[in-house]
C-alpha cells in the first residue's frame, strides 16, 4: 500500500471510487457478474468489512480527493435503509469528497419509490443509473427482470419528481427473440423521456448463465449478430440530437 509523501501529488487531480454491492433479490438470467441472491444474512458483515477496507485505502493513499463515486452491483438499492448513507459517511472520514462530486447508484426500477429516491438524494447520491434493459415485457421476463415496462417508466418519472435530475437509463439489445420493431418501440419511448444519459449494451451470452444454457441446446434462438448491428445503428441515429455527446461506443449524454 502507498502511504508516502508523493501519494498526494500522484492523485492531485483526484480519483474515482467504484464500490461493488454484490447482493440481489433475484439474479438475472444473463448475469455473470459477482452477484448473489439469498445471502441477506451476509449484508451486515459485508458492510463492516467494506468500511474497514475503505479506511485502509483512505489512509494508505493519503486521503486523496474523490471526483466521482459509483455504487454498482449487484443491486445497491437492495441494501437496507441507511446502508448507503453509512458507506458515504465512512468515505468522507478518510477521503476528501469534492462538493460537486458525481455520486451514482445503480438501481432496479422496482426498488424505486418517492421515499427511497428522496432519501438517496438527501444522503448525497445525485445520480441514478436505472436498469430498464427493455420496454418489452416478454424480453424482460426472458432476462429475469422483476419489473415490467410500466414500472420502468414509472421509476424514471418518480426519480425525476423526487428531485434526481441526473439519470442514466440502461438498455440491452441483441437479445434472443428480440425483433427490430420491439427495439424501435423501446428506444423511441426512452428517447422521448429525455434522460440525461442513455447506455445501451449488446447482450453477451456468458457460459454458466441460465440464458446461455437455454440457447446452447436450441431451446432458444441465439441472438442474430446482423440484426444486433442494425439495432445499434438505428438507436445511434435516433439518439443523435443537438447537444448530445456520443462519448463512447455505448453511451450518450445530454445537456441539462
Which role fits each region the language model picked out?
Residues 17-21:
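Short active-site neighborhood of thiol/selenol oxidoreductases, capturing the structured segment around
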Residues 2-14, 35-59, 64-256:
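C-terminal scaffold of the Radical SAM
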Residues 22-35:
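Local cysteine-cluster metal-coordination motifs and their immediate loop/turn environment
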Amino acid at each position: 500500500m502507498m502511504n508516502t509523501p508523493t501519494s498526494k501529488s500522484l492523485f492531485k487531480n483526484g480519483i474515482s471510487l467504484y464500490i461493488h454491492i454484490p447482493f440481489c433479490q433475484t439474479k438475472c438470467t444473463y448475469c455473470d457478474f459477482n452477484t448473489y441472491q439469498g445471502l441477506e444474512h451476509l449484508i451486515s458483515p459485508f458492510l463492516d468489512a467494506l468500511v474497514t477496507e475503505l479506511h485502509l485505502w483512505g489512509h494508505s493513499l493519503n486521503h486523496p480527493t474523490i471526483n466521482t463515486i459509483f455504487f454498482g452491483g449487484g443491486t445497491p438499492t437492495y441494501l437496507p435503509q441507511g446502508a448507503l448513507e453509512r458507506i458515504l459517511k465512512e468515505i468522507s472520514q478518510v477521503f476528501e469528497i469534492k462538493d460537486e462530486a458525481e455520486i451514482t447508484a445503480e438501481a432496479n426500477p422496482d426498488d424505486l419509490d418517492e421515499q427511497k429516491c428522496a432519501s438517496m438524494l438527501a444522503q448525497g447520491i445525485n445520480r441514478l443509473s436505472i436498469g430498464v434493459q427493455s420496454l418489452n415485457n416478454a424480453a424482460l421476463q426472458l432476462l429475469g427482470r422483476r419489473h415490467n415496462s410500466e414500472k420502468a417508466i414509472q421509476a424514471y418519472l418518480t426519480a425525476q419528481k423526487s428531485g434526481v435530475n441526473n439519470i442514466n437509463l440502461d438498455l440491452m439489445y441483441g437479445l434472443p427473440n428480440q425483433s427490430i420493431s420491439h427495439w424501435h418501440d423501446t428506444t423511441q419511448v426512452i428517447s422521448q423521456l429525455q434522460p440525461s444519459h442513455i447506455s445501451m449494451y449488446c447482450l453477451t451470452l456468458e457460459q454458466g448463465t441460465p440464458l446461455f444454457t437455454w440457447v446452447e441446446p436450441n431451446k432458444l434462438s441465439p441472438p442474430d449478430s446482423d440484426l444486433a448491428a442494425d439495432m445499434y445503428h438505428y438507436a445511434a441515429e435516433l439518439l443523435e440530437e443537438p447537444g448530445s455527446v456520443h462519448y463512447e461506443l455505448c453511451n450518450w449524454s445530454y445537456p441539462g
